[in-house]
Design a protein with these regions (language model features):
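Charged, cofactor-coupling segments
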Residues: 101-109, 195, 199, 235-236, ...
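Short, well-ordered loop/turn sites that connect or cap secondary structure elements
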Residues: 256-257, 308
Length: 329
């Protein structure tokens, strides 16, 4: 009886320890994630214009909605800049076009340009390398004038910008290979720079007047084969356009912010690529490297099947601002 009692006590202690570890791993972030203070604009306060010219630069902002930060188990520093990366300008496409899932060769070529030698390692470790194509609806804006560093130092500066809707497609397998790297967000950039990976609406909306911290406060949405996957108000963004431009300048101090440059402001929650926070923290504790993580992500056929595949129709839209739909092949 005493042995049985002791076993029961040990099992009880074990349950408590495991429970405590799980609670610790699944703890929330230390800082509350709050939306920025915006001057909300209605669409009748501006006009629509066509735009066809390719921008010289496309900048991407990451982790700019609380929902997306939480679903990807990402860290958040209220005093820090959001992730910033550059997309290839030839990734732009328009409504009704087709978007090709990148082949293994195209992905390895992109990786090799960023990190010479990595393609050999990937070939050795992975017989299969699915792209893990994912969608991201985003409010985008285009610069209507050159912006100087002096402008960005003015807290009351109201950049002259026009707004549009974009889908910021990404091959998540490449982004995972940036885990733990000093230039992690450059991997995000290459994962989002394939041909057709930036579908945009065909018009830009330009406010009649430019005020600090102003955006059109509208619902943005993603549908895949008619099913709503993302739906969020743009007023839930964590950063203002000025803060985003300041972050871009700090990341790329030698690049000029030029008229025609585009900024994609980040996506809300609802993407395919999501991971519980406790799993991410446990992976860090046991020392999983980027290749281990990619193996974990690509080994579960059910999880891989959730990503976009040939034949899918992906629509992103902004309430009154426009929409763009593409077909995956």
């Amino acid at each position: 009886m005493r042995i049985i009692k002791n076993i029961g006590i040990l099992l009880g202690v074990l349950v408590l320890v495991v429970g405590a570890i799980f609670i610790y791993l699944n703890r929330g972030l230390p800082d509350e994630i709050k939306p920025a203070n915006f001057n909300c604009l209605s669409l009748d306060e501006g006009t629509f214009m066509d735009f066809d010219n390719l921008p010289k630069n496309i900048y991407g902002i990451g982790l700019s909605y609380a929902g997306h930060i939480n679903e990807t188990a990402s860290d958040f520093d209220p005093d820090g800049d959001p992730p910033v990366f550059i997309k290839a300008n030839n990734s732009i496409t328009k409504d009704g076009n087709k978007v090709k899932i990148p082949s293994r060769k195209r992905m390895l070529d992109a990786l090799e340009q960023l990190e010479p030698g990595i393609s050999e390692t990937v070939n050795q470790k992975f017989k299969s390398l699915p792209a893990l194509l994912d969608y991201e609806v985003e409010l985008g804006f285009v610069l209507l004038e050159d912006i100087t560093s002096a402008n960005l130092k003015n807290a009351d500066y109201a950049p002259k910008i026009g707004f549009f809707i974009a889908n910021d497609f990404g091959a998540r397998s490449l982004a995972v290979l940036g885990e733990g790297q000093a230039n992690r967000y450059d991997y995000w950039g290459i994962s989002k720079s394939f041909s057709g990976f930036t579908p945009i609406s065909d018009k830009i909306w330009i406010p009649k007047g430019f005020k600090a911290n102003s955006i059109p406060c509208i619902n943005i949405e993603t549908q895949v084969n008619g099913e709503v996957r993302q739906h969020q108000l743009t007023s839930d963004l964590i950063y203002t356009p000025l803060q985003m431009l300041q972050a871009i300048h700090r990341k790329y101090p030698n690049k000029l912010l030029l008229k025609g440059d585009m900024v994609l402001t980040g996506t809300p929650g609802g993407v395919v690529m999501s991971t519980p926070r406790w799993i991410v923290r446990l992976a860090g504790m046991i020392g999983m490297d980027r290749f281990d993580k990619l193996t974990k992500v690509t080994s579960d056929k059910k999880d891989v099947a959730k990503f976009l595949k040939a034949g899918d129709k992906v629509l992103v839209k902004g309430e009154g601002l426009g929409s763009v739909e593409v077909n995956i092949y």
